[in-house]
Amino acid sequence: MDIALFSPSSLFSEEDDVSSNGEEKEETQQSFVERKHEFPGMELTIREFSFHQLNANLLWPGTFAFVEWLVEHRSWIEGRRCLELGSGTGALAIFLRKLFHLEITTSDYADQEIEDNIAHNCRENGITPALPHVKHTWGDSFPIAEPDWDLVIASDILLYVKQYPNLIKTLSFLLKSYKSKDDGAVPQTKKEETAMCIGLPKPAFLMSWRRRIGKEDESLFFSGCEDAGLDVKHMGSRVYCIKLRETTKNNI
């Protein structure tokens, strides 16, 4: 797997059009490479940026480990309305749509190239129209006032420690402001309630984290979640489920 090249200083902020010596910067034309990737039960063709300043250019190895876990626990996510944060190339969402027929929306930084590339990868792998997409920069106001996704997922998004507070702010909003699309539906049966207890709550954030960072940095995110009224549970294989703390729920 190639190593992603990026400029951390340019993340989540606009760059000046003029360099420090007053000369205008030349715009470079974006280049891509298409790769075939093996997923459980299928092969996906994914177009990746040769370089992207927001680090959305490559399909990271952790995605494949997360996919294996999701396939093993497919009954926990089938039938859920899902939002993926930090979709990058869109490969994970495309896989879940094709294998589980999951109702899933992609999301990433407000960058048109990212959205266009996800749409391209959807079409390339037989998903038309393309999956719905939400442009959102962590920490900013979310463009949807009453989100109805009962499952939020992400893979390998804890790379930049300075963005943890913004990510937690977005997560808190999505979990606390969740409004079920099926409020008028028939109540769950006892069997369904039992399955929910041993599976994933609604709403929940399910995250896989495979890239290795310092323990202190990693703990900053999880302790930040706890401080925000969220509970963190390790589900095994470095997959974490984050949900509203019961006392927080009751105060909403």
Short names for language-model regions:
Residues 1-252:
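S-adenosylmethionine-dependent methyltransferases
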